[in-house]
Amino acid sequence: MPYELTLASATTGEKGYVWQGEVPFGIVDTAAYRSMNPNGTIPTIDDGGCILWESNAIVAYLARRYAPDRLFGGSEITFARALQWMIWANYSVDPALHALILHLERLPASQRSAETVEASRQEVVRKLELMDARLEGSAFFAGDAFTIGDIPLGISTQRFFHFGLERPALPRIERWLARLGEHSGFRAHVAPLEKHLPSRTGTRTA
């Protein structure tokens, strides 16, 4: 289950939760599932007949419908600023991070490339430096309060930090991560190492 969806649901309030099925992702290759999501990918939600797929779309929907005050201060301007960071994370940070996951965790050793790892590390670091500069004078990415914009960035940053790769000093990002850690959803679903790198802890993600 993508952390964006789990964390957003955990943040909507005490009754906000996401059911996580077992047999990891095996249910996606069925006619019933494909009728909801023709891509056969996760996640997909059916909220009273509102069927949605793609993590960021679902997070934005959950925030607007169930927790606008909690997740973007009820402000359309703040929502738009948060959304721009969600989109930016998806296209600017995640491709290089995905390459790191493949070449450090998922591919057989014979298929891993040290050159790809280093190039991807440098690309992520460049984005982190941009993020660190953005946080000057701002507690979070869309302003002074936690929003949906911090969710994908927090997930990606935490995962990169767990890799233990070389990085420059990023004091504002470290303070921002500490602030994210004040949220129980972040502590439960994002901070633990096993949520990102199960092979290093002897566990797997659901």
Model-derived features with residue positions:
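Acidic/histidine-enriched, glycine/proline-rich intrinsically disordered or flexible terminal extensions
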Residues: 193-206
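GST-like domain detector, emphasizing the conserved glutathione-binding G-site
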Residues: 1-118, 132
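Short, solvent-exposed turn/loop segments enriched in Gly/Ser/Thr/Pro and often Arg
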Residues: 9-11, 148, 193-194
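Compositionally biased, intrinsically disordered low-complexity segments enriched
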Residues: 56, 185-186, 191, 198
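Short Asp/Glu-rich motifs
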Residues: 14-17, 179, 199-200
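GST-like fold's C-terminal all-alpha helical module
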Residues: 73, 86-185, 189
